[in-house]
Amino acid sequence: MDDLADCREVFAYFDSKGDERISVQQVGDVLRALGQNPTEAEIHKCVGSFDREARLSFEDFVPIFQSVSKNREKHTVEEFVEGLSHFDKEGNGMINVAELRHLLTTLGERLSDEDVDQLLSGHNDSHGNVNISDFVRAVMNS
């Protein structure tokens, strides 16, 4: 199945009224169901031209999906590893789990403690450190 067919199938699943439309508030859920992981800021940017009560057709949704998909491709594993490597004090590819938790809950699009617990689960070693490359790959592939 190609991306557009997947997109149409998931879009139809979220069409609760049977009018071949989804609400603006559902856009993020549909994108996530399609394997995307947009930030709330990205979603807001994509739907900002629509009224909050608007219902989007599939034709309205496709450019949003394509935009988010393209943005995701721009961010590579290497870029995220490089960004986190600035916090690698020992130069051994590891970051302290407490410091990583602090970064994830205070910078950029802040994550909740529960989300961070889920992300970090199983990634820290016996010394309280996380392998940066392994962590980034696991997060990007989830």
UniProtKB/Swiss-Prot annotation:
Annotated knockout phenotype: Arrest at the 1-cell stage embryo due to a cytokinesis defect characterized by a failure to form a contractile ring.
Entry-linked SUPFAM superfamilies: EF-hand
Main location: cytoplasm
Residue intervals of the EF-hand domain: 2-37, 75-110
GO MF term (any one): calcium ion binding
Top-level taxon: Eukaryota
Tagged with keyword Cytoplasm: yes
Free-text function comment from the UniProt entry: Required for cytokinesis and embryo elongation. May regulate myosin II complex formation and/or the association of myosin with actin. May be involved in the organization of mlc-4 and nmy-2 into bundles.
One term under GO cellular component: myosin II complex
Keywords carried by this UniProt record: Cell cycle, Cell division, Cytoplasm, Cytoskeleton, Motor protein, Myosin, Repeat
Record's subunit section: Myosin is a hexamer of 2 heavy chains and 4 light chains (two regulatory light chains and two essential light chains).
Protein name: Myosin-2 essential light chain
Gene that produces this protein: mlc-5
InterPro entries hit by this protein: CALM/Myosin/TropC-like, EF-hand-dom_pair, EF_hand_dom
GO biological process, any: mitotic cytokinesis
Compartmental location: Cytoplasm; Cytoplasm, Cytoskeleton
